[in-house]
């Protein structure tokens, strides 16, 4: 409800979460895992820069993954009338992942909303996209090998195209009241000309 991604426009959100310190952290993580990250980039056709940026935004490169027991979080949230079905489905999926042995229930600490690992996957995302990339018969999203491969697999499967722009300059219909377009206008006015 009170998460900044819901009340800050994209430009403000990204600017507040990027710094030269964070850039240095990302470069250090890349240099320590260069072979793995390059292999995953080539296999899944997802840029290493995108994966590192997402990990930096989501968990500060794995240094803050959350401390909440996500089983308890999801059980509690499943009683919240606003999104009861969503969180109940996530809870059931998590229980199925535990029962099947795909995830270790002792490691399931993450966000208050039930997200887990270096890239903050919800249980349904784990179920649909996470990979046991190191072949140890467990999906460990707090391990760089499984985490990067799972993030790349997720992005690839939802349609990410390497070296294609993710934003396009658009012409806004002047009949649409600007109060509905503020986030779009604020972001696109500064960033649309800078797409890669």
Regions picked out by a protein language model, each given a short descriptive name:
Residues 1, 47-62, 94-99, 151-152:
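Short, functionally critical alpha-helical segments immediately adjacent to catalytic or ligand/cofactor-binding
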């Amino acid at each position: 409800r009170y998460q900044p991604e819901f009340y800050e426009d994209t430009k403000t959100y990204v600017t507040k979460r990027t710094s030269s310190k964070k850039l240095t952290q990302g470069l250090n993580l890349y240099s320590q895992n260069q072979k793995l990250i390059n292999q995953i980039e080539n296999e899944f056709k997802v840029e290493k820069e995108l994966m590192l940026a997402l990990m930096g935004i989501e968990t500060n490169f794995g240094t803050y993954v959350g401390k909440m027991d996500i089983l308890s979080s999801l059980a509690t949230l499943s009683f919240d009338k606003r999104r009861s079905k969503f969180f109940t489905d996530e809870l059931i999926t998590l229980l199925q992942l535990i029962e099947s042995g795909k995830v270790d229930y002792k490691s399931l600490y993450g966000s208050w909303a039930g997200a887990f690992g270096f890239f903050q996957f919800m249980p349904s995302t784990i179920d649909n996209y996470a990979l046991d990339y190191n072949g140890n018969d467990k999906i460990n999203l707090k391990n760089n090998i499984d985490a990067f491969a799972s993030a790349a697999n997720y992005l690839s499967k939802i349609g990410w195209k390497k070296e294609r722009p993710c934003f396009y300059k658009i012409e806004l219909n002047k009949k649409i009241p600007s109060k509905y377009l503020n986030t779009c206008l604020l972001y696109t006015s500064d960033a649309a000309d800078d797409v890669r």
